[in-house]
Design a protein with these regions (language model features):
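Amphipathic alpha-helical hairpins
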Residues: 1-144
């Protein structure tokens, strides 16, 4: 998140979503507790996935912001699918409180996915403008 200083709106939204993600983990732990399950497997899986995602996010390259936006888009949609599956399971086993908690998380993920989707183009264009302004070739093209 700290490397997103050139994209303040993105940085702010990622910081907000980090807070949401912490709440989502707390909700998941509550759901597992309600169902008498251990959270260790869930935590291991979540930490593994987040580690892989984090590695993708931290791979430095000139176009990392574009790659990160695409990875965010993919990951948010993966989380949406996961929550929908968990909600279906809760409906089947009759755990309405768990379903309510998971729906809250699903809504947050859908909102984040929508935000990312709406910002892929503006972030891409901002990146291109920054590259054009910073490179000699880009400045020459802008002067024409």
């Amino acid at each position: 998140i700290d490397r997103r200083q050139d994209y303040p709106e993105l940085r702010t939204r990622l910081q907000q979503h980090l807070v949401e993600t912490t709440s989502q983990l707390e909700r998941l732990e509550s759901v597992l507790k309600e169902m008498g399950e251990s959270s260790s497997t869930l935590k291991d899986t979540a930490l593994s996935m987040m580690g892989n995602f984090s590695a993708m996010m931290h791979a430095a390259s000139s176009d990392e912001i574009i790659k990160n936006m695409l990875a965010n888009n993919m990951f948010e949609n993966f989380e949406i699918g996961t929550y929908k599956s968990l909600i279906a399971m809760c409906g089947r086993v009759g755990t309405p409180q768990a379903e309510t908690l998971l729906r809250s998380s699903l809504t947050e993920e859908e909102n984040m996915a929508r935000w990312v989707d709406e910002h892929i183009e503006p972030v891409t264009l901002a990146f291109l403008a920054r590259v054009a302004h910073e490179s000699p070739e880009g400045r020459a093209r802008m002067a024409q």
